[in-house]
Amino acid sequence: MTVTLALPSKGRLKDATVELLREAGYPIRLPENERRYRAGIDGLDGLEVTFLSASEIARELDRGSIDLGVTGEDLVRETIPDWESRVEIAARLGFGHADVVVAVPEIWFDVSTMADLDDVAADFRHRHSRRLRIATKYWRLTQQFFSQKHGIQVYRIVESLGATEGAPAAGSADIIVDITSTGSTLKANHLKVLDDGVILRSQACLVVAKKKRPAEDARLIAELAKAVRR
């Protein structure tokens, strides 16, 4: 059998992953043509490497069409329902750090915590006869954080098709849930992160699909995971 490893197809995440695997003794034999999305590792015929976007990797892990892949923990938790029963985070890789956060307009001077936001949500319903609008691409993480962790029920998620951080200024949402690495984009859009508004501290992870596989394949996956752990 052949084990399929999916890697990010472009950008810093791809470069960091390829370098990490090289340092761990798994040098990727990159295709000469960048339009080709298949590769291999010298001396390891049982492992096939494919290049996909980080979001595609999370989806294909959920489907079980690949054995393991490198993607963001935020995408795993957002994309895969009941993710812990479907996949395993075999290693956190120490790069690709970013936080999924709740951010509100800076002019909301008296709102600094989720408890404050709960009061605001109730006030919106009373004063404006509508629910607090949250722009985000992270529907699942937002619902879990607001409803399950903080007991906030009076809100409405609006779909974010473009730059999420611009939604409050555009009038399409009141607050946002988005991912940030430095916070500079939030600040440029006059938004602030709530004191207890970090939903997830994400990073790049090696993620393994939970499925039946031959012992030889399982051993190869375990060896690779051990080699890249930091």
Swiss-Prot record:
Q: What Gene Ontology terms describe where this protein resides (cellular component)?
A: cytoplasm
Q: In which pathway does it act?
A: Amino-acid biosynthesis; L-histidine biosynthesis; L-histidine from 5-phospho-alpha-D-ribose 1-diphosphate: step 1/9
Q: Name one GO biological process term.
A: L-histidine biosynthetic process
Molecular-function annotations in GO: ATP binding; ATP phosphoribosyltransferase activity
Cystine residue pairs: none
The reaction(s) catalysed by this protein are: 1-(5-phospho-beta-D-ribosyl)-ATP + diphosphate = 5-phospho-alpha-D-ribose 1-diphosphate + ATP
Query: Which Pfam families does this entry report, sorted A to Z?
Result: HisG
Record remark on domains = Lacks the C-terminal regulatory region which is replaced by HisZ.
Q: How does it assemble?
A: Heteromultimer composed of HisG and HisZ subunits.
Alphabetical list of PANTHER family matching this protein: ATP PHOSPHORIBOSYLTRANSFERASE (PTHR21403:SF8), ATP PHOSPHORIBOSYLTRANSFERASE ATP-PRTASE (PTHR21403)
What name has this protein been given in UniProt?
ATP phosphoribosyltransferase
Identify the species of origin. Chelativorans sp. (strain BNC1)
Task: Recall the taxonomic lineage recorded for the source organism.
Answer: Bacteria, Pseudomonadati, Pseudomonadota, Alphaproteobacteria, Hyphomicrobiales
